[in-house]
Amino acid sequence: MKILLSNDDGIHAEGIQILARELRKFADVTLVAPDRNRSAASSSLTLVEPLRPLRLPNGDYCLNGTPADCVYLALNGFLSGQVDLVVSGINAGVNLGDDVIYSGTVAAALEGRYLGLPAIAVSLDGRQHYESAARVVCELIPRLHGQILQRREILNINVPDIPYEEIKGVKVCHLGYRAAAAEVVKQQDPRGEAIYWVGPAGLAENEQEGTDFHAVKNGYVAITPIQADMTAYHSLQSLQDWLESE
């Protein structure tokens, strides 16, 4: 199996390095990742400057672009041979609910799906037990490849930040959602000018049983199938009826 591995935390992030090590025990892995942290880059592509892949001594590549750039360029540019699967992660921090809209981790997987390949995104609810998340992924891939992963979807996997032995199991979940993130951090630069930082994500507002929030909070791996089609199908008919009533 040939796997393209990327992330949004950057090529030197602990999560992607641990996952690459474990995946290489059973697969041919090509790692192409941003040269720095590109968290929350979503599916943005770099269109106003050239992309420069740098091949490192160990054969991995870093790129001066976004996670989506990495997957797009690797699959359309410099990689030779057939890729069987795109994997993105391990992200430092969960991508639950509305997070998937902003997530570069999820976007890298979606870019693989756009280009016709099965793909998964994996995130850890913290920064400690990356080995747990890597083990989960390595156990799931042989079971999923050639079956679920052939659909026009990606799988968004979130793992609790606990030792592997304490994980209670795996649950298939739908996305929850967060409250609005209204906090902005205002500071001053050395010249006294105002500068701003985007604050933390909103708290979980829907973490009922069946959501990804609930699963991870209670010690389960959450797997959510995600599709790029964001059409609100349940509203199509009511919208059509409204237009025709005018």
From Swiss-Prot:
Cofactor requirement: a divalent metal cation
UniProt main location, coarse: cytoplasm
Recorded GO CC terms: cytoplasm
InterPro entries: SurE, SurE-like_Pase/nucleotidase, SurE-like_sf
EC number: 3.1.3.5
CC cofactor note: Binds 1 divalent metal cation per subunit.
Keyword Hydrolase assigned: yes
GO molecular function, one term: metal ion binding
Keywords of this entry: Cytoplasm, Hydrolase, Metal-binding, Nucleotide-binding
Cross-referenced Pfam families: SurE (PF01975)
Record-listed a divalent metal cation binding positions: 8-9, 39, 91
Catalytic activity, reaction form: a ribonucleoside 5'-phosphate + H2O = a ribonucleoside + phosphate
Keyword Metal-binding belongs to the record: yes
Localization terms from the record: Cytoplasm
Domain of life: Bacteria
Enzyme class, broadest EC rank: hydrolase
NCBIfam families for this protein: PRK00346.1-3 (NF001489), PRK00346.1-4 (NF001490), surE (TIGR00087)
HAMAP family for this protein: SurE
Family: Belongs to the SurE nucleotidase family.
Annotated function: Nucleotidase that shows phosphatase activity on nucleoside 5'-monophosphates.
Name of the molecule in the record: 5'-nucleotidase SurE
Natural source organism: Pasteurella multocida (strain Pm70)
